Amino acid sequence: STSTPHSNNANRTANLELACKALNGVVLNPGETFSFNDTLGERTTAKGYKSAPAYSGDDLVNQVGGGICQVSSTLYCSALLADLEIVSRTNHGFPVNYINYGMDATVSWHSPDFKFRNNTNYPIKIEASVSGGYVNVQILGTDEKDYYVEMSYVVSETYKPETEYKDFKPDNPEGYKNGDVIEEGTTGYLVKTYKSKYDKATGVLISKDFVANSRYKTVNKVVARVEEPTEPTTVPTTPSTAPSTEPATTPTAPSTTPPTTPSTSEPSTTEASENGGDSGGE
């Protein structure tokens, strides 16, 4: 049997209880395949499922039926320990906190699904419950084996997050300052899961077999990069030339032509110009 601790989120706990109720008492005859989605059906509010945290892609969001992956994961572990044939299993995008790396099995309607087959010679029965802060699943049947199973895992690769920068203006509405961490990075892993069989009588290791790879995603760290406030782009300009106090136009010098000798003829009836020798400029 397998037990995994659950949180005290009321909606999530209600979903766990509904899922366990649907599983409890299911019987598989030899050769039959169990489907988690077929057994539970679509998770809807009409069936009593509530909105609770669940992964959607890379984000943790509220979904109707959120949390039931803990039930499918606990069942997956029990199926491995019973040495049943795993038909279909998918790990989460990120490690979960209620079970070991490589031992989780995510489900969603319609896909992914979790399936296993009764590869024994006798019927098996699933018992599932929520009690004492734990999800409990055990698979009952006729034990023909002279060995018992233990599961283990190895983190074969680690993928460190990189740092990404997001640009903001100095007066950004979020109020970010330069260097503020917007999103913490998440380390990714490649996990290999193994099944070891030990002789019941002697405890001697009989075999150790590879079961599955589980690739958990890397999420880069995001840091705010805020522009420096800019200085005013215009400054008072200095006149290119000092203002002149001199007149813009130089006065014309008086003509040097000597006065005309008065004519001996009689004066004309038209009066001569008083300044006939000037150029006329001001």
Each model region followed by its residue ranges:
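Well-ordered beta-sheet/strand-loop patches within structured domains
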Residues: 1-282
